C-alpha cells in the first residue's frame, strides 16, 4: 500500500523559528538589552567541522546574535584548551559557547565537555544537562534531539501512546531523543524502543513502529521492507558518499533509503534539508535561553 507522504521540511520550519528568535532579539535591544553572544571553539581544519561552524556563524547573523570564533591548530595542548574554556566560562559577555567535536586524539573530549559551565553549555553535552534532561528538569537539550522534537511539534505529529523506534544509542542523538519523547506531554508520551548494532531483530521491531528515528550513521540502512504504511520517519544520518555525477564528487546521504521508503510514509524528513537546519536553529534557541538565564 502506498500513501502520499508529506515532507517534514526542516529548512522551512527553521526559517520560521529564526524569524521568531530575531523578533525576540529586537525586543531585547529596544528594552536596552544586548545581543545574545554565542562563541565557538574550533580545533584544526576538519572539513565537516569547518562547514558546521560556518553555518552556525551565518545563523547567528540571521537572528541578530553576536558570534565569535576562537581557532586553534591541531597541536593545541589539552591545558591550552581547558584554559580557553575557563576564560569563556568567566567572560560575562559570552552567553553560551560550543567546543566543536571531534577533537584531536591527544585531547580528552569528556574532560573538555565537563569543564564547560553547564549554564553556558548550549550544546547540552555536560553531564549535568544530560542528567537534568533524564529527570525532566529544565536544562540545555542537545541541539539535534531538540530540533527533531520541535519539527514533530510544528507539524502536529501525534506522539502520545505511539511506538517510537530509535535506531542508534549515541549520547548526542539516540539517548537524548529517547528521553525527550518519553517525557509527559506532546511531543512525548511515546513508548520507546532503542535499537543498535547488537539488536538481533531490527527489521521486526521497526515494522511495529509508528515513528522511526534513524540515527546510526549507516547510509541507506532503513529500507522499505522495514517500515509499516503510514509511519513517520526522521532521518538523522549525514554521510558523504561518492557520486561521480556531482561536481564535488560526493553527495550527502541519510540513514534512510529515501526514494523507496518515502512512498510508505505519512511524513518523512529529506536529507539534506530535514534535521540539519533544525539542529542549527536549536543551538540558536539554546543561546537565547542562556542569555535570558535559563538556570537563574
UniProtKB/Swiss-Prot annotation:
<dbReference type="GO" id="GO:0006164">
    <property type="term" value="P:purine nucleotide biosynthetic process"/>
</dbReference>
<keyword id="KW-0511">Multifunctional enzyme</keyword>
<dbReference type="InterPro" id="IPR020867">
    <property type="entry name" value="THF_DH/CycHdrlase_CS"/>
</dbReference>
<keyword id="KW-0378">Hydrolase</keyword>
<dbReference type="InterPro" id="IPR020630">
    <property type="entry name" value="THF_DH/CycHdrlase_cat_dom"/>
</dbReference>
<keyword id="KW-0368">Histidine biosynthesis</keyword>
<keyword id="KW-0658">Purine biosynthesis</keyword>
<dbReference type="Pfam" id="PF02882">
    <property type="entry name" value="THF_DHG_CYH_C"/>
</dbReference>
<feature type="binding site">
    <location>
        <position position="197"/>
    </location>
    <ligand>
        <name>NADP(+)</name>
    </ligand>
</feature>
<keyword id="KW-0560">Oxidoreductase</keyword>
<keyword id="KW-0028">Amino-acid biosynthesis</keyword>
<comment type="pathway">
    <text>One-carbon metabolism; tetrahydrofolate interconversion.</text>
</comment>
<dbReference type="GO" id="GO:0009086">
    <property type="term" value="P:methionine biosynthetic process"/>
</dbReference>
<protein>
    <recommendedName>
        <fullName>Bifunctional protein FolD</fullName>
        <ecNumber>1.5.1.5</ecNumber>
        <ecNumber>3.5.4.9</ecNumber>
    </recommendedName>
</protein>
<keyword id="KW-0521">NADP</keyword>
<dbReference type="InterPro" id="IPR036291">
    <property type="entry name" value="NAD(P)-bd_dom_sf"/>
</dbReference>
<comment type="subunit">
    <text>Homodimer.</text>
</comment>
<dbReference type="GO" id="GO:0000105">
    <property type="term" value="P:L-histidine biosynthetic process"/>
</dbReference>
<dbReference type="GO" id="GO:0005829">
    <property type="term" value="C:cytosol"/>
</dbReference>
<dbReference type="InterPro" id="IPR000672">
    <property type="entry name" value="THF_DH/CycHdrlase"/>
</dbReference>
<dbReference type="GO" id="GO:0035999">
    <property type="term" value="P:tetrahydrofolate interconversion"/>
</dbReference>
<dbReference type="InterPro" id="IPR046346">
    <property type="entry name" value="Aminoacid_DH-like_N_sf"/>
</dbReference>
<feature type="binding site">
    <location>
        <begin position="168"/>
        <end position="170"/>
    </location>
    <ligand>
        <name>NADP(+)</name>
    </ligand>
</feature>
<feature type="binding site">
    <location>
        <position position="238"/>
    </location>
    <ligand>
        <name>NADP(+)</name>
    </ligand>
</feature>
<comment type="similarity">
    <text>Belongs to the tetrahydrofolate dehydrogenase/cyclohydrolase family.</text>
</comment>
<keyword id="KW-0486">Methionine biosynthesis</keyword>
<dbReference type="Pfam" id="PF00763">
    <property type="entry name" value="THF_DHG_CYH"/>
</dbReference>
<dbReference type="InterPro" id="IPR020631">
    <property type="entry name" value="THF_DH/CycHdrlase_NAD-bd_dom"/>
</dbReference>
<dbReference type="GO" id="GO:0004488">
    <property type="term" value="F:methylenetetrahydrofolate dehydrogenase (NADP+) activity"/>
</dbReference>
<keyword id="KW-0554">One-carbon metabolism</keyword>
<comment type="function">
    <text>Catalyzes the oxidation of 5,10-methylenetetrahydrofolate to 5,10-methenyltetrahydrofolate and then the hydrolysis of 5,10-methenyltetrahydrofolate to 10-formyltetrahydrofolate.</text>
</comment>
<dbReference type="GO" id="GO:0004477">
    <property type="term" value="F:methenyltetrahydrofolate cyclohydrolase activity"/>
</dbReference>
Amino acid at each position: 500500500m502506498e500513501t502520499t507522504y508529506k515532507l517534514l521540511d526542516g529548512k522551512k520550519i527553521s526559517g520560521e523559528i529564526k524569524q521568531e528568535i530575531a523578533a525576540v532579539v529586537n525586543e531585547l535591544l529596544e528594552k536596552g538589552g544586548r545581543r545574545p553572544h554565542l562563541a565557538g571553539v574550533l580545533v584544526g581544519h576538519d572539513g565537516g567541522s569547518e562547514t558546521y561552524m560556518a553555518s552556525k556563524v551565518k545563523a547567528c547573523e540571521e537572528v541578530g546574535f553576536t558570534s565569535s570564533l576562537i581557532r586553534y591548530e591541531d597541536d593545541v595542548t589539552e591545558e591550552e584548551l581547558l584554559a580557553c574554556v575557563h576564560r569563556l566560562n568567566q567572560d560575562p559577555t559570552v552567553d553560551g559557547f560550543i567546543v566543536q567535536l571531534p577533537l584531536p586524539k591527544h585531547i580528552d573530549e569528556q574532560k573538555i565537555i565537563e569543564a564547560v559551565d553547564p549554564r553556558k553549555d548550549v550544546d547540552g553535552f555536560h553531564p549535568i544537562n544530560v542528567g537534568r534532561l533524564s529527570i525532566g528538569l529544565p536544562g540545555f537539550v542537545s541541539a539535534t534531539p531538540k530540533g527533531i522534537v520541535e519539527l514533530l511539534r510544528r507539524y502536529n505529529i501525534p506522539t502520545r501512546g505511539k511506538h517510537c523506534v530509535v535506531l542508534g544509542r549515541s549520547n548526542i542523538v539516540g539517548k537524548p531523543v529517547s528521553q525527550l519523547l518519553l517525557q509527559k506531554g506532546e511531543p512525548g508520551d511515546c513508548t520507546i524502543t532503542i535499537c543498535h548494532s547488537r539488536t538481533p531483530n531490527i527489521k521486526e521491531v521497526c515494522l511495529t513502529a509508528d515513528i522511526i528515528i534513524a540515527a546510526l550513521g549507516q547510509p541507506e540502512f532503513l529500507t522499505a521492507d522495514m517500515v509499516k504504511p503510514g509511519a513517520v520517519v526522521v532521518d538523522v544520518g549525514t554521510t558523504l558518499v561518492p557520486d561521480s555525477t556531482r561536481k564535488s564528487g560526493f553527495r550527502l546521504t541519510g540513514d534512510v533509503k529515501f526514494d523507496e521508503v518515502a512512498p510508505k510514509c505519512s511524513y518523512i524528513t529529506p536529507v539534506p534539508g530535514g534535521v540539519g537546519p533544525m539542529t542549527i536553529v536549536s543551538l540558536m534557541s539554546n543561546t537565547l535561553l542562556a542569555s535570558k538565564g535559563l538556570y537563574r
